[in-house]
C-alpha cells in the first residue's frame, strides 16, 4: 500500500483538515502522521455538526483504527499536546498517539519572545505560538527534545522506524502537512513566511519518509485563497468585496480575520510543480458557486462550478481528485478513480 502526503498550495487555511479527515475515514490508513512546523497552524474539521480544531495532533484523529504520529521535524508544545489529548478523549487518542523522541520542544520563553518581538509579531505577523524562536534554538542546537520532557515519556517513539516498518508491511500511511506553499521559508513570500519549508518533500522528511517511498502528493487549493498576517497577496480583493461575497473567515490559531483574494492560477501551477503534485483537491467550491453546495456527484455540479474545475486542471496541469462542496465530511466529490 502507498504513502500519501497532503499539503497546502496557497497561504494555509486551504481546508486541508477537511480533506485529511475524509481520507482518514474513507481510505482507512493504518498510520496518520503529522509533519510541518508545529502548533502555529490549526486544522479544523466538522463531525456531525461539531467543530474540532487541532494544532498539534494529526487531523485524522477521528479514524479510531489508526496510529497517530508526530514526526521528528515537528515542534511540540507539551501544553497544547496534553490539552488536545483531553479535548479529543472521546476518540481515544491517548492510547494511539506517538511523538518522535527527537521532536524539539516549544517552551514558554519561545512563546513570550514570539509575542513580544516587534519584528516577528509586529512586521511579520506571527501567530505568537513560539515556533520561530523554537526553531531558531533548534538550529543553534540549544532546543530541548521530547526525550528530555518526563511527562512525554509514555508517548515517545521512533516515528521514522514505525512508518517505514508499516510501509514494508504494505500498510497505508497518510501524512499531513501544515500551512501552505506561499508560507514556505524557501519558496514563499520571504520574509513574510513561516520558520521552515513546508513543501511535500520537507513534510516527507519530517516524518522520516524518503523520496522514493512517496506514492501520491495531494496539493489543496481553496476556491478563494486567504492569508493571515502581513505579506504580499497579488490577487487580494478589497475587504468590502469579500464582505459582499460572504467570504468572512477567521484564523484557527490567531482568531484574526483572513485576507481574501481571487484564485491565482499562476501561483497554483508553480506550487503544484514544486510540490510534485499527483492530484489536486479543491475546497469551498460552494463559495465560488453557491449552487454547488452539498453536491456529491460531479455530473450534477452546476455549469459555473464545472468550468472552474476544468480551468484549474487545464491551467495548473494536474488533475483534480477531490472537491469539497460544503463544511461537513460528506460534502465531497471523489474523482480519484478517474485519474
UniProtKB/Swiss-Prot annotation:
Entry binding sites for Mg(2+): 13, 42
Reactions mediated catalytically: IMP + L-aspartate + GTP = N(6)-(1,2-dicarboxyethyl)-AMP + GDP + phosphate + 2 H(+)
Cofactor(s) the protein requires to work: Mg(2+)
Annotated catalytic residues: 13 (proton acceptor), 43 (proton donor)
Main location: cytoplasm
EC number: 6.3.4.4
Binding of IMP, residues: 13-16, 40-43, 127, 141, 179, 194, 256
GO cellular component entries: cytoplasm
Cofactor note: Binds 1 Mg(2+) ion per subunit.
Keyword tags: Cytoplasm, GTP-binding, Ligase, Magnesium, Metal-binding, Nucleotide-binding, Purine biosynthesis
Binding site for substrate: 252-258
One Pfam family linked to the record: Adenylsucc_synt
SMART domains, sorted: Adenylsucc_synt
Ion transport among keywords: no
GO MF terms held by the record: adenylosuccinate synthase activity; GTP binding; magnesium ion binding
Highest taxon above the source species: Archaea
Family matches, as PROSITE patterns: ADENYLOSUCCIN_SYN_1 (PS01266)
HAMAP family, alphabetized: Adenylosucc_synth
Family that this chain belongs to: Belongs to the adenylosuccinate synthetase family.
Function: Plays an important role in the de novo pathway of purine nucleotide biosynthesis. Catalyzes the first committed step in the biosynthesis of AMP from IMP.
Subunit structure of this chain's protein: Homodimer.
Protein name: Adenylosuccinate synthetase
Organism: Pyrococcus abyssi (strain GE5 / Orsay)
